[in-house]
């Protein structure tokens, strides 16, 4: 795995960040080497991300402490990090090489697809994407993930809680 990562940076010397694939988690990214678009950053989990440390330090980029496990605000810290990097103009590539296996352990924050989960999803989405785009993404999320949560909450219940999280705007960064 280390050799795959080093070779990718050797082959892509202008890359600041490279997103890889995982052995046991299908990706929604294209199966080729390319520069993903902004919204594709929402399809990435943290264990897929590698970066040049100097690029992150030089651009004063950090993971947002308001998001992630332990914050009570929901997940998405890796997506916000990638979007911040994208907005700063860093070169972010996807290389369809599998570098790791994601082990499924008990989550420190996910307790099921309940009203609170969807509320926090709306809250973090608003914080990351702003109001307009978060409303559109919230609708997309409720529809596209329906098969995963339909035993726990209705699509209307999920959407209602997502929109409540978006409108309450408790993280108050983006308008």
Regions found by a protein language model. Name each.
Residues 3-7, 80-84, 120-123:
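Alpha-helical elements of Rossmann-like donor-binding domains used by nucleotide-donor carbohydrate transfer enzymes
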Residues 34-56, 72-74:
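A recurrent flexible, glycine/aromatic-enriched loop bordering the glycosyltransferase active site
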Residues 1-38:
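Conserved donor NDP-sugar-binding/catalytic core segment of glycosyltransferases
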Residues 63, 89-103, 113-114, 133:
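Catalytic beta-strand/loop signature of glycosyltransferases that borders the donor
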Residues 112-175:
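Non-catalytic, C-terminal membrane-associated alpha-helical segments of glycosyltransferases
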């Amino acid at each position: 795995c280390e050799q795959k990562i080093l070779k990718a940076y050797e082959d892509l010397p202008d890359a600041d960040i490279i997103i890889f694939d995982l052995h046991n988690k299908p990706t929604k990214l294209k199966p080729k080497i390319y520069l993903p678009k902004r919204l594709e950053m929402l399809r990435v989990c943290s264990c897929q991300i590698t970066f040049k440390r100097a690029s992150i330090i030089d651009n004063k980029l950090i993971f947002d402490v308001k998001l992630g496990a332990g914050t009570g605000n929901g997940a998405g810290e890796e997506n916000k990090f990638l979007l911040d990097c994208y907005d700063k103009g860093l070169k972010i590539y996807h290389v369809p090489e599998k570098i790791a296996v994601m082990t499924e352990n008990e989550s420190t924050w996910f307790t099921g697809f309940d009203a609170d989960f969807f509320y926090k999803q709306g809250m973090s989405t608003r914080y990351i994407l702003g109001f307009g785009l978060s409303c559109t993404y919230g609708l997309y999320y409720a529809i596209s993930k329906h098969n995963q949560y339909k035993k726990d909450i209705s699509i209307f219940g999920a959407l209602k809680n997502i929109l409540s999280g978006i409108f309450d705007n408790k993280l108050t960064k983006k308008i």
